[in-house]
Amino acid sequence: MNINAPPKRIGIMGGTFDPLHYGHLVAAEMARHEFALEKVIFIPTGNPPHKVGRRVTSSGDRYEMVKRAVQDNSFFEVSDLEIQRKGYSYTVDTLKDMHKLYPQHELYFITGADAFREIFTWREVQSVLSLSHFIGASRPGFDPHEFLEELKRDYPEFLPHMHLFDVPALAISSTDIRSRVKEGKPIRYLLPESVRLYIEETGLYRI
């Protein structure tokens, strides 16, 4: 064992995934390559506090869609960690649990630019920042200046934990996919075919 070897890195992509689409998969794959991640674990939220008041598809359906979407990539896995947890799903709790499961690894939490910018509003933000590196998948028009200035001012010690990287512009959103299904519009090529077929078979998003 080489004690001087750098610690292994695991990527975590949390989200509602209602449904998961190619935008999520492209960001995860590019982050895996860019940051030399051993693998990326997708963790569908169980009871997301930021979605209170909005109808969210059952955790079982969302988990199954993610499972089908990642099954052909040996570097991707799906976990039901948050789904099995009672109460609201908070990132700080998930990161603590992941540290117990992977004590010898560094964690890299992958998120979109908008969520990246809202990290300061997350529960126990100081603990969150200390538990993981954060990778923000940037998009055209995203200006990180204000966010980075706030980070330098309030949490300068965590600046090395924050990373931004550019991903190809994919104008795909879960909200748009749900709307298209409800309106009877095609969603082929917006998400994996296995997920599209699951939506069709189960009748999700039609109401």
Swiss-Prot record:
Q: What family does the Swiss-Prot or TrEMBL record give for this protein?
A: Belongs to the NadD family.
Q: Where is coiled-coil annotated?
A: none
Report the gene name: nadD
Spell out the HAMAP family in the cross-references. NaMN_adenylyltr
Enzyme Commission no: 2.7.7.18
User: What's its catalytic activity?
Assistant: nicotinate beta-D-ribonucleotide + ATP + H(+) = deamido-NAD(+) + diphosphate
The Gene Ontology biological process annotation of the record reads: NAD biosynthetic process
Q: Briefly, what is this protein's role?
A: Catalyzes the reversible adenylation of nicotinate mononucleotide (NaMN) to nicotinic acid adenine dinucleotide (NaAD).
Per the record, the pathway is: Cofactor biosynthesis; NAD(+) biosynthesis; deamido-NAD(+) from nicotinate D-ribonucleotide: step 1/1
| Record Pfam families | CTP_transf_like
Q: Which InterPro entries match?
A: Cyt_trans-like, NadD/NMNAT, Rossmann-like_a/b/a_fold
Q: Under the GO molecular function aspect, what terms does this record hold?
A: ATP binding; nicotinate-nucleotide adenylyltransferase activity
Protein source organism: Desulfitobacterium hafniense (strain DSM 10664 / DCB-2)
Q: What are the UniProt keywords, alphabetically?
A: ATP-binding, NAD, Nucleotide-binding, Nucleotidyltransferase, Pyridine nucleotide biosynthesis, Transferase
**UniProt-recorded name of the protein:** Probable nicotinate-nucleotide adenylyltransferase
